[in-house]
Each structure stands twice: as structure tokens, then as C-alpha cells.
């Protein structure tokens, strides 16, 4: 279900055909025995929507019975790493998986028959990105990937572009990822705006709700802008947020999984009208550059 994320699409090799890629939540898994069920799986589909290949964690049975969806977060294709193309996805276990698109790895049964499962996933790189689950889709710009776990900070990882990479996401294997100083609750998605690949133009956007799930009360979102490229005091620096001038910039009430959308020099954020007592009327907040002072 991917927390509102869409599907991914692209070739599986430099000269390969285009495929559609999805990640699924809990459910039956029978693909390894010729069945049609792909619970907790990364699935590679032809453009005719026929499964072509897949990856399923060896712990799928345990994940399924304990509500540990692989597909609670969306799937994203990474920047090209030489002749090998990858996708990344992460779910409720807090594990980030990197799949080789040409050969996602299939399924390898665990070495035990009880939970927690033990074993090895074939042709897969996996990393413990967080002790909390992921309910978000990652974002990327050039060779950088950004991930946000529930109740955590945004983490920035640099792709290892060697061929083939022995460790696709360098900081997870060799050190600590750079993180934002702001932490986020459940339901925040992140996006990037930039002037193409021009250095110094990349901005990372995220909309935070402080009301749900801690109080279950609707509250205005806070839209944040971060410097997507640089590091200040070992952290991702904040550039701006919508609480700086609340009389002008306050948003409507936050909606989980809403993605800040960038087009034509503006940022669009879907919210709920905070003046509506029935909480049924939507609101579209639009942010852009201004020279006007806050008043």
C-alpha cells in the first residue's frame, strides 16, 4: 500500500526494456511455488502487468503474521550505478532493501521454521536504516537519497557509484547518515525541487503534523524547506518553515501521506480547511517566493 506512493517505472539495465515496479504489504505468498500471491514483495512487472521477477524477504511468513509490511513505504529507482540498476524500498521493520532490477533475487527460504526467522536474502543488499518503521517514499537528487522513518529525522545517504557497488548506500555501511535536526511523526512524505542538476538549487520539502497520532487531533501542518545538498554542524540545515510567519504562511490541517508538490516555481500542499468544524472540506495551500516582509 506504500503510504500513498505511486508505482515506479524504468529499464532494468542500460539497454533493457521498461518495467513497472511495485512493493506490496502483508498477505499470502505463493509465488515461490508457482502461485499468484506476492505478499510482502518487490514485484517487477511487464508493461502488460505480468510479473517478470520479484524479491521476497526470507522472513515473509513472520512479517505477515506480525503486521510488518514490507510495502508500508514506497519504491524508488536510484541513480544509475554503472551497468547495474537498483531500486530501494523500506517497510515497517526499519530495513532498507536495495534490489538489482535485472535480478531482484526471488525468495530464499529461512533456515528455521519459527519466528523470528533467520536466513539470507539472495542478491540483495539490506541495511537497518531505523529502529522505527517507514511510512514514506524516499526522495533523491543526483547521487543522494533521503529517507524518513516514523518518529525520526530525515536521513541523507550517498550512493556508491562504483561498479558493482559492494555497499550501495555508503553511510549505512561506513558511518552515520547526515540527518535533519527536525523529527517527524507518522504520515510525512518528502520531495525535492531543483533547477535540473544545477548545484546549489536543491531543496528538500516535508510537511509535519504534530497532532496525529500523539493526540489524534487535527492541527495545521508545518511545511519545512531544507538544504538538500549541504551539511551544517553535521546536520541537514533548515532553510525555512511555515511557522516563521504564521499570519501569512499557516497551512490548513495536516493530512497524512500528502506529498509537497513542486511546479512552476511554487510548492503545493493539500490540507483540510481548519475553519471547517466538520473536517470535510479540503484546502490547497500554495507557497512561492516573495519579497514582502512578514506582518
Which residues does each predicted region cover?
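Acidic/polar loop-and-plug regions of large Gram-negative outer-membrane beta-barrel proteins
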Residues: 5
Amino acid at each position: 500500500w506504500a503510504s500513498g506512493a505511486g508505482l515506479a517505472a524504468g529499464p532494468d539495465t542500460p539497454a533493457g526494456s521498461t518495467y513497472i515496479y511495485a512493493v506490496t504489504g502483508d498477505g499470502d505468498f505463493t509465488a515461490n511455488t508457482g502461485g499468484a500471491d506476492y505478499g510482502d514483495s518487490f514485484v517487477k512487472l511487464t508493461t502488460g502487468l505480468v510479473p517478470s521477477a520479484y524479491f521476497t524477504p526470507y522472513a515473509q511468513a513472520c512479517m505477515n503474521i506480525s503486521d510488518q509490511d514490507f510495502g508500508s513505504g514506497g519504491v524508488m529507482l536510484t541513480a544509475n550505478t554503472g551497468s547495474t540498476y537498483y531500486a530501494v524500498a523500506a517497510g515497517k521493520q526499519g530495513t532498507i532493501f536495495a534490489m538489482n532490477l535485472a535480478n531482484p533475487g526471488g525468495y530464499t527460504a529461512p533456515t528455521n521454521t519459527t519466528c523470528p526467522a533467520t536466513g539470507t536474502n539472495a542478491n540483495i543488499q539490506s541495511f537497518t536504516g531505523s529502529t522505527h518503521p517507514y511510512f514514506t517514499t524516499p526522495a533523491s537528487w543526483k547521487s543522494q537519497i533521503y529517507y524518513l522513518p516514523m518518529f525520526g529525522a530525515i536521513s541523507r545517504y550517498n550512493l556508491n557509484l562504483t561498479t558493482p557497488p559492494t555497499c550501495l548506500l555508503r553511510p549505512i555501511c561506513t558511518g552515520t547518515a547526515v540527518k535533519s535536526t527536525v523529527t517527524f511523526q507518522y504520515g510525512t512524505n518528502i520531495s525535492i525541487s531543483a533547477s535540473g542538476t544545477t548545484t546549489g538549487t536543491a531543496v528538500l520539502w516535508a510537511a509535519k503534523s504534530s497532532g496525529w497520532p500523539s493526540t489524534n487531533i487535527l492541527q495545521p501542518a508545518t511545511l519545512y524547506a531544507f538544504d538538500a545538498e549541504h551539511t551544517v554542524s553535521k546536520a541537514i540545515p533548515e532553510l525555512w518553515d511555515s511557522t516563521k510567519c504564521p499570519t501569512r504562511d499557516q497551512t490548513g490541517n495536516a493530512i497524512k501521506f500528502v506529498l509537497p508538490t513542486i511546479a512552476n516555481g511554487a510548492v503545493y500542499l493539500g490540507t483540510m480547511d481548519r475553519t471547517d468544524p466538520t473536517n470535510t472540506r479540503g484546502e490547497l495551500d500554495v507557497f512561492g517566493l516573495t519579497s514582502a516582509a512578514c506582518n
